[in-house]
Amino acid sequence: MISESDILKCFQHLVDSSYHKDSILLGSGDDAAVIDTQGRKLVHSVDISRIGVHFHESMRPEDIAYRSITTALSDLAGMGSFPSFISIGLTSDIEEISWYEKFSKGIKETLDEFSI
């Protein structure tokens, strides 16, 4: 089985050849990357959660949202940073609008809990 580290190595050349590579203080690793943006350090993290790997399909949408966000927050904490905002990417075959409404509610509740 291919490891996450092996896959990340396939993309390292993109960082190495970036026009802005001097702004990349710490390249993307398992947790996050540190980027210098006009004198401020920005820690950027992207996570993917997958049904059957990170959560079971029987979980409530609110709980999936909570788990997804708190996992990302843990990565940021591991880098010694504090969250300012989140960005969400979602792919799904679920065709019930109520599922997305509940997922959205779970996101809002989690963001409120952590004052984001």
Outline where the language-model segments fall.
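Extreme N-terminal cap/leader segments of soluble proteins
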Residues: 1-60, 79, 88, 105-110, ...
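A glycine-rich phosphate/pyrophosphate-binding beta-strand-loop-alpha-helix module
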Residues: 62, 66-116
